[in-house]
Regions:
Chain B
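Generic hydrophobic transmembrane alpha-helix motif, especially the helices
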Residues: 69, 73, 100-105, 110-175, ...
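Transmembrane helix boundary and interhelical loop/hinge segments in multi-pass membrane proteins
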Residues: 172-181, 280-288
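Transmembrane alpha-helix boundary and packing residues in multipass membrane permease domains
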Residues: 31, 110, 139-144, 153, ...
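Transmembrane alpha-helices
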Residues: 88-104, 193-225, 274
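Short hydrophobic alpha-helical segments within the ABC transporter permease transmembrane module
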Residues: 82-84, 126, 169, 173, ...
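Glycine-rich helix-loop "coupling/hinge" segments at transmembrane-helix boundaries
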Residues: 143-145, 157, 173, 222-266
Length: 331, 289
């Protein structure tokens, strides 16, 4: 049994809006094991990005963590002061890769200045030494002629190169956890494959655990060890990646997987899930998925289902009521 | 001139392609040189009184001649020399006042925009109060209470004109702080101070620089109007504003254009030139072009 490196318990994130207060993330719990990749999958508005931002304490001004605990190395970071988190956690134990390599680099700072920033901040090394480490990291993320690149500005690099720089920035302090928020969405497919390979390879060289947030199931199949499927701020299914893909249980997961195009069949239109994710202000009662669910029952409209074990998976759906119940809130 | 392919390198290239901006820059530079080398250019001391040949009478209101290129003023002083030295005073007042207002405005704008909430509220109400000050009356009352000096003019202009810079900087911070690279910097554990100084400030420097040029032009105009009304730069120190004071006399206004046209024209020229530079900078920094 490997060590748990990140443990999120009963996390709820609340947003204040014009129309009231809403839970963007609703009582979710999960763990990330050492040197594993956990993928959080979901459509837009499912709360997957909010979860990662909450862990990084980067929530927008109108959002806050209303309850729950986030343990990094068995320390609850929500009990720390913001300067403690900034000094001891962010950039040191957890780092993040952003979705848009075009905008996530400061346009007027040279690559080198941006990478060395967190080394100087966290390890107190001199500028020269930090520069050497940065150069070394750039080599490891596969940037050709890093001596030259390190002196360039972000706009002189291609999208793929910039994402490599982002990864170098995230890895330069050798964090234990790397959160990747759709890191390949903005890239084209060939570059995407390269970046995924790189992340995979760096995971073993740097012994990092990865929390991978994405909506792209192909990427999940490629990279994840375990998968969490989110819908409307709740975890509706979780399990090892093989089980989720071979044998999805929740009607939503089944629907998602059915929408994936395959190379074999060319039978015209792709299947879709009816309807769309309800907005945070208009979530239905009972199971949030029931209006779109092909198997909905009467009680789905009024009661929220518990979480039931099916093989290696945990599913939040009444279809599996006969199975062993885990907890009512998603652990 | 700048690091190749940097933001400022591109801006420099765009600026130099803008003819009006380059002319404006040249005119501004001309006046700056005039101010710097005033003792070499001016034929006389600015406060030197001239007498009518062989008499013990001031040579007042003398028409332009080879001796006095732009004639003499109401006290028999050489207008051209005062004009040259006046460039010094006018520019010093404008630059120091703009430095004060830029520093105050930038600091307040940064804090207000970055931290938001109550800090923002306090500072923005302060801005509202300062904007509502009747500047002219304030200055007139200050100059009647205190001994008028050039420093009062500088601080007065500085302390009333930082509000537009503060608002501009605040708006820019609000825009920039939502960008991904600020979140990325925060995700690296960068401190607030460092994010403000290293990531936000350099990225909003361009609009601040535009604001500085426009602020300089406005400060020159403000100095001119204050001095014209007698509450700005005091005699015998020459400034383009107080040189225009003589024009308050109908006789001078009607019959002695050499006394008031030159300071008025240079004032106009310099302000216009600085505005052209400001416009040029704004276009040059606009990377969408």
């Amino acid at each position: 049994m490997s060590k748990t490196i990140l443990r999120v318990e009963d996390l709820s994130v609340r947003f204040r809006t014009e129309e009231g207060v809403f839970n963007a993330v609703d009582n979710i719990s999960f763990t990330l094991e050492e040197q594993k990749t956990l993928a959080i999958v979901g459509e837009s508005g499912s709360g997957k990005s909010v979860t990662s931002l909450a862990i990084m304490q980067l929530l927008a001004e109108n959002g806050h963590i209303s309850s729950g605990e986030i343990y990094v190395d068995d320390e609850n970071i929500l009990n720390m002061s913001s300067s403690q988190v900034q000094h001891n956690i962010l950039g040191k134990k957890i780092s993040m890769i952003f979705q848009e390599p075009m905008t996530a680099l400061n346009p007027i700072l040279k690559i080198g200045d941006q990478i060395t920033e967190s080394i100087i901040e966290h390890q107190g090394t001199g500028k020269k030494e930090a520069y050497e480490i940065a150069l070394d990291t750039l080599k490891q993320v596969g940037i050709p002629s890093p001596e030259q690149r390190i002196k360039q500005f972000p706009h002189e690099l291609s999208g793929g190169m910039r994402q490599r720089v982002m990864i170098a920035m995230a890895l330069v302090t050798r964090p234990k956890i790397m959160i990747a928020d759709e890191p390949t969405t903005a890239l084209d497919v060939t570059i995407e494959a390269q970046i995924l390979n790189l992340i995979e390879q760096l995971k073993s060289t740097f012994k990092t655990s990865i929390l991978f947030v994405t909506h792209d199931l192909n990427v999940v199949a490629d990279i994840a060890d375990d998968v969490i499927v989110m819908y409307c701020g709740q975890i509706i299914e979780r399990g090892p990646v093989v089980d989720i893909f071979e044998n999805p249980q929740h009607p939503y997961t089944k629907g998602l997987l059915a929408t994936m195009p395959t190379l074999e069949d060319h039978k015209g239109e792709l299947p879709t899930i009816q309807g769309g994710v309800p907005s945070i202000t208009q979530r239905p009662g009972g199971c949030y998925f029931h209006p779109r669910c092909p198997h909905r029952m009467k009680k789905c409209e009024t009661q929220s289902p518990g979480v039931y074990t099916v093989g290696q998976q945990q599913v939040k759906c009444f279809l599996f009521e006969g199975n062993k119940e885990e907890r009512n809130d998603g652990k | 001139m700048f690091k190749k392919n940097s933001f400022y390198d591109f801006a420099y290239r765009r600026f130099t392609r803008n003819r009006l901006a380059v002319i404006g820059f040249a005119v501004t530079l001309f006046f700056v040189i005039m101010a710097l080398f005033a003792p070499l250019i001016a034929p006389h001391e600015p406060s030197e009184f001239f007498f009518v040949e062989g008499q013990n009478v001031y040579d007042k209101y003398a028409a332009p001649s080879s001796e006095h290129l732009l004639g003499t003023d109401s006290l028999g002083r050489d207008v051209f020399s005062r004009l040259v030295y006046g460039a010094r005073v006018t520019m010093m007042v404008a630059l120091l006042a703009v430095s004060i207002s830029t520093v105050i405005g930038t600091v307040i704008g940064l804090l207000s925009g970055y931290f938001g909430k109550i800090i923002d509220n306090i500072f923005m109400r302060l801005v509202d109060i300062v904007i509502s000050f009747p500047v002219l009356f304030l200055l007139i009352s200050i100059s009647t209470i205190m001994d008028p000096s050039i420093w009062i003019v500088i601080f007065a202009i500085g302390f009333v004109s930082w509000t537009s810079t503060a608002r501009l900087v605040r708006a820019e911070v609000l825009r920039v702080k939502e960008l991904d690279y600020i979140a990325a910097a925060r995700a690296c554990g960068t401190s607030n101070l460092k994010i403000i100084v290293k990531h936000i400030l350099p990225n909003i420097l361009a609009p601040i620089m535009v604001q500085v040029t426009i602020g300089t032009a406005q400060a020159i105009l403000m100095e001119a109007s204050l001095s014209f009304l007698g509450v700005g730069v005091q005699q015998p120190t020459p400034s383009w504003g107080n040189m225009l004071m003589d024009a308050q006399k109908l006789l001078v206004l009607r019959d002695m254009p050499w006394i008031w046209i030159p300071p008025g024209v240079v004032n106009l020229l310099l302000v216009l030139a600085i505005y052209f530079v400001g416009d040029g900078l704004r276009d040059a920094f606009d990377s969408r072009q």
